[in-house]
Amino acid sequence: MEEFQGYLELDRYQQHDFLYPLIFREYIYALAHDHGLNRSILLDNVGYDTKYSLLIIKRLISRMYQQNHLIISANDSNQNQFFGYNKNLYSQMMSEGFAVIVEIPFSLRLVSSLEATEIVKSYNLRSIHSIFPFLEDKFPHLNYVSDVLIPYPIHLEILVQTLRYWVKDPSSLHLLRFFLHEYYNWNSLITPKKIIFSKSNPRLFLLLYNSHVCEYESILLFLRNQSSHLRLTSSGIFFERIHFYEKKKYPVPVEKVFVNDFPAAILWFFKDPFMHYVRYQGKSILSSKDTPLLMNKWKYYLVNLWQCHSYVWSQPGRIYINQLSKHSLDFLGYFSSMRPNLSVVRGQMLENSFIMDNAMKKLDTLVPIIPLIGSLAKVKFCNALGHPISKSTWADSSDFDIIDRFVHICRNLSHYYSGSSRKKSLYRIKYILRLSCVKTLARKHKSTVRTFLKRLGYKLLDEFFTEEEQILSLIFPRASYTLKKFYRGRIWYLDIFCINDLVNHE
């Protein structure tokens, strides 16, 4: 946000709610490019950096001033050259710059709310696995759970209408319609992975999706407050911001919750003694300690809310209510289930001794090995059975680049899944990547795997065996007096702001 405040004349634009002229400013595209580079830290770089230059941005802006050249038919070939670059790059640059502009109203509200609550920033954040204490503390005491797939709008115009409550600039909304109608495949919106987590245009559709979900969740929260007089505890986890937030232990107004939680959050939940609601990406989880009657009530709340207010179609029969003890949750890339953890306690009173069997439920977080192998097979690291193969498209790179790419992916997956209670599946994934790296190097040097390892030695793969503790710095300073106040409550930290494509398996 310092970049926004440093470049933009915020008072003048806020006064008139007029954001459209910013599309012609060069620094907007620079901010979008910096955001894309930060996301690529956890992704396989596909040449994002090499396609962008200040000269291309200048040419793009000069062309946008000419109205006849701005409109490109969707029927044109994707390889039609625009000053030497194809139409996909042209539309990608404009959509990313436009997403930065539309985020300005939300970012300003976010900064003002942070200043009001004295929540400070930290760039040394902890692991994503600190989210799971929420499940470990509460879910073992619950009985029923339901996985809900959040439906998508029937028409893209619904997304534009939702954004009108936040962006008052008609020109910006018309430009948004232009992007939706001219540049993007309408059928792909139905599949959330292809749009929300796409490498080509993640920011714009992430913004549209969050505004759509935020709209109906604000009403859902209102219904929850009307149905219960108990105190509400709400929490927000942000993957697109490098801020951390205190768990709120007090009743929170509806407007404040969603102004704070909206800008780029893909995980949000509230809970009370009767009902727990968790949203992650395009899914939501309902869990309850009570009877199935309460679960059915909230299920019909959701369906009626989607159909009557958000104009999306959903059927109650597609939302199944399961017993938590017999059902596994697909949450944050893990398979989470409850398993009994038996412990024997021997006690003695005077001369009499006795033995007590204490059965406790424990959250079991497993690595989804089959979907991960499918993801590795899709990008040609192994076959469908999990047997490692060489990455032929990388064989032309240098040895250092090949090893660095494999180590980057291996460390990323190891970091993400190191919180698993059973690491056997994680070791298998690391084995596939190590052997695929060796086969790729052997293919490049036209040798066999055994001969290649015998010639260079096994020290070649030492990078794969580096312990995670030697790579990640998880030290958090406690010297500040302001920070000491937040340590009294539960604070959750994230350092993964973009989930790897291999984690977002189908």
Curated annotation (Swiss-Prot):
GO annotations of cellular component type: chloroplast
Compartments where found: Plastid, Chloroplast
Keywords: Chloroplast, mRNA processing, Plastid, RNA-binding, tRNA processing
Matching InterPro entries: Domain_X (IPR024937), Maturase_MatK (IPR002866), Maturase_MatK_N (IPR024942)
Coiled-coil annotated residue ranges, if any: none
UniProt GO BP: mRNA processing; RNA splicing; tRNA processing
GO MF: RNA binding
HAMAP family from the UniProt entry: MatK
Family of the protein in this entry: Belongs to the intron maturase 2 family. MatK subfamily.
Function of the molecule: Usually encoded in the trnK tRNA gene intron. Probably assists in splicing its own and other chloroplast group II introns.
Name of the molecule in the record: Maturase K
Organism: Crataegus monogyna (Hawthorn)
